[in-house]
């Protein structure tokens, strides 16, 4: 059987090194500096709880018939337009180097993002865009400072999300956005102000409390008002009284469903007058890599967009559209309208069915595991990143460096250029994948790596979700569904016995590592991922 190298020739990216990683500065901890004053002396309403039910916990997959028609099989979440699930994925090769590429535009819209080595200490992203197109946004925000740090839990949690009720139905849909910069005040049962905080860029707020009765007050601008309260299930409704602007809670254990939905009032929002949204484009886009061949094979009918590639491999890559190469700005951008047009053209030109339903999604985490509140990823001295767990959103906030020698290991929270929102991911997966230097006509090319994510393959992996770490397996072996239909499906995850390991509903970041890299427990709730490149690579 021919190896991939032979096929391409025939056609024409340790613990002992951690001492050199630099001092990492991360800031998990609430920085609560609201600017709106609490309502002094205002009488608190009488607490009269209304019993409500809760949504059935999500459990979907792995086969297509186990996903509702309006649920994205790559996230386990509802989509706004289910018809887009009939459009194959758009796969964008997105630059991470040079630093001019950052912050990238569109990453918060991608259900999956692969990060992989392109040698010389640099990494690149492959964004999987499916079920929703990116859109530029000037986020709706309150009058207070947006909270920019993950929440640090020290006691029982009370809080959760302030969101934009786009369809004004009083129900929090999966695709509706959060509202940052809302000041939130916490009162005890006697009406005494205890704490103040603000919502983060994705709308989450919270307090560390002891068991007891509390009132939460939301300080919203005059151009916003509350949606109707107590519609539907407790975990998806708005709890704020539209007139009192408050919600009550009897806290006996962690309570993360005290939400507030907002809609426009009759007044005009002064903060957006004359402010233009970011350009409607995604990227920056850079060159294609050999890894795309394998990923294309398990994302059938997908459309790959990149900026050319090395001449030795370009003829073999899955080409859907090539963008002009622009190295000075970190890569060329692609207009969102062009992306939509390409997706429609690709949809119309493809024949045969496809499905990306391959994994199980569950709100209930697997049993066991180790505490994982932070993941530090070391690729090179000037390529360090981290994921910090936020218990309010149940996701990991992404942090990156600035690639400079003097600031090596100093990290900052990363946003999406399209909307200014914090990047956060519910699942972080480290894949152990065999990689080697590519050879062309018998000569190694140290700047090109070949990573083997081939159909029929498998290997070890690490899953981080819900602030926990799990040892799992990745697999591309054909299951009964593939054997009966002949259709390939995306990479999936199991335990050591081959049982499905559920992903958490939401976005997934996949780091393509090597079998000789390290995932090390720092014994303080944090983990280090140390990438070791293949022998002979740059």
PLM region spans:
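C-terminal motif of bacterial Sec signal peptides marking the signal peptidase cleavage site
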Residues: 19-20
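Short, low-complexity, disordered segments immediately C-terminal to signal peptides
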Residues: 25-47
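A surface/extracellular/periplasmic glyco- and lipid-processing/surface-interacting theme
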Residues: 53-114, 119-154, 265-538
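A short, Gly/Thr-enriched small/hydrophobic beta-strand-prone motif that recurs across taxa
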Residues: 154-171, 183, 259
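Structured interaction patches on ligand/partner-binding surfaces of diverse proteins
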Residues: 210, 220-266
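A short tyrosine-centered beta-strand micro-motif
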Residues: 214-216
């Amino acid at each position: 059987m021919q190896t991939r190298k032979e096929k391409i020739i025939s056609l024409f990216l340790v613990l002992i090194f951690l001492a050199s990683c630099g001092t990492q500065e991360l800031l998990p901890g609430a920085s609560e500096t609201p600017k709106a004053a609490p309502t002094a002396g205002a009488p608190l309403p009488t607490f009269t709880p209304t019993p409500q039910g809760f949504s059935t916990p999500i459990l979907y997959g792995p086969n297509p018939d186990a996903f509702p028609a309006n649920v994205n099989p790559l996230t386990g979440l509802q989509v706004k337009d289910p018809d887009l699930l009939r459009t194959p994925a758009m796969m964008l090769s997105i630059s991470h180097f040079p630093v001019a590429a950052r912050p990238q535009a569109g990453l918060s819209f991608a259900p999956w993002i692969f990060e992989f080595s392109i040698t010389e200490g640099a990494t690149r992203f492959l964004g999987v865009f499916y079920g929703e197109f990116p859109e530029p946004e000037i986020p709706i925000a309150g009058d207070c400072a947006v909270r920019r740090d993950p929440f640090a839990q020290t006691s029982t949690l009370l809080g959760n999300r302030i969101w934009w009720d786009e369809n004004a139905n009083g129900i929090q849909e999966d695709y509706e956005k959060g509202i940052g910069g809302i000041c939130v005040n916490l009162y005890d049962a006697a009406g005494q102000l205890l704490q103040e905080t603000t919502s983060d860029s994705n709308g989450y707020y919270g307090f560390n409390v002891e068991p007891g009765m509390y009132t939460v007050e939301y300080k919203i601008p005059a151009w916003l008002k509350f949606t109707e309260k107590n519609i539907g299930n407790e975990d998806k409704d708005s709890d704020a009284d539209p007139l009192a602007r408050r919600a009550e809670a009897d806290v006996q254990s962690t309570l993360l469903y005290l939400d507030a939905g907002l809609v426009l009032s009759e007044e005009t929002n002064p903060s957006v007058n004359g402010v233009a949204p970011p350009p409607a484009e995604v990227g920056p886009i850079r060159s294609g890599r050999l890894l795309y061949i394998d990923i294309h094979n398990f994302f059938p009918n997908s459309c790959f967009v990149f900026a050319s590639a090395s001449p030795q491999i370009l003829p073999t890559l899955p080409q859907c559209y090539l963008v002009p190469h622009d190295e000075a700005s970190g890569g060329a951008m692609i207009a969102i309208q062009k992306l939509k047009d390409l997706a429609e053209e690709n949809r119309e030109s493809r024949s045969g069915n496809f499905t990306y339903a391959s994994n199980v999604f569950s709100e209930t985490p697997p049993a066991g595991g180790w505490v994982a509140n932070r993941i530090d990823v070391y690729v090179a001295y000037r390529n360090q990143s981290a994921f910090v767990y936020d218990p309010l959103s149940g996701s990991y906030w992404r942090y990156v460096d600035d690639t400079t020698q003097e600031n090596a290991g100093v990290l900052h929270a990363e946003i999406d250029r399209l909307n200014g929102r914090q990047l956060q991911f519910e699942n972080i997966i480290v894949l152990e994948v065999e990689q080697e230097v590519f050879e062309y006509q018998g000569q190694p090319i140290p700047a090109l790596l070949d990573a083997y994510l081939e159909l029929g393959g498998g290997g070890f992996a690490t899953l981080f979700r819900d602030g926990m770490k799990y040892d799992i397996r990745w697999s591309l072996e054909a299951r009964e569904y593939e054997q009966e239909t002949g259709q390939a499906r995306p990479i999936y995850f199991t335990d050591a016995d081959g049982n499905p390991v559920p992903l958490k509903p939401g976005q997934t970041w996949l780091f393509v590592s090597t079998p000789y890299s390290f995932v090390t427990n720092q014994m303080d709730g944090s983990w280090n991922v140390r990438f070791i490149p293949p022998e002979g690579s740059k």
